[in-house]
């Protein structure tokens, strides 16, 4: 069920969107459209009790790269937004755990991410500002992805 919702659904929707975009003329901004997928820090952060979720999000990351490579010559950039700990209903039941992690500095920006943070990342990628980019992953995780010792 998790794989169907989190991986197959976005893959099939992206394929439908790409087919539609391919039928369109290239716009003045040089694109036919943009495909943006939402993954999670779980794409590359192991959580044994959420293995299927992690696999599905890692799959989204690979899907983004495959589609980016396939669609680059057709003027359709493809991007991934990878949120960290975002304050939503999904994270409410583990709020105390994440509050402690934030306090301990696991997330360098030391705050919860907000849905508006993710929306701003999507808006940036959809804006057409990044005219020579595709296949990129935009981390919206308060610096969590930065490797540290």
Task: Label the model's feature ranges.
Residues 1-4:
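Active-site Tyr-X3-Lys motif and surrounding loop/helix of classical short-chain dehydrogenase/reductase
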Residues 40:
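Residue(s) in the substrate-gating loop at a strand-loop-helix junction
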Residues 45, 123, 134-149:
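Short C-terminal tail/terminal secondary-structure segment
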Residues 14, 56, 64:
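Active-site helix of classical SDR
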Residues 19, 69-70, 131:
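Alpha-helical segment proximal to the catalytic Tyr-Lys
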């Amino acid at each position: 069920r998790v794989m169907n919702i989190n991986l197959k659904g976005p893959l099939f929707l992206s394929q439908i969107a790409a087919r539609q975009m391919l039928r369109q003329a290239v716009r003045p901004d040089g694109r036919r459209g943009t495909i943006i997928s939402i993954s999670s820090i779980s794409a590359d952060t192991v959580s044994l009790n959420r293995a299927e979720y992690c696999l599905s999000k890692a799959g989204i990351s690979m899907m983004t790269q495959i589609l980016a490579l396939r669609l680059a010559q057709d003027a359709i950039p493809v991007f991934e937004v990878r949120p960290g700990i975002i304050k939503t209903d999904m994270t409410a039941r583990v709020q105390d755990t994440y509050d402690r992690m934030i306090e301990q500095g696991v997330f360098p920006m030391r705050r919860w991410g907000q849905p508006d943070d993710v929306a701003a990342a999507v808006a940036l990628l959809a804006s057409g500002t990044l005219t020579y980019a595709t296949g990129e992953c935009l981390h919206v995780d308060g610096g969590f992805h930065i490797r540290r010792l």
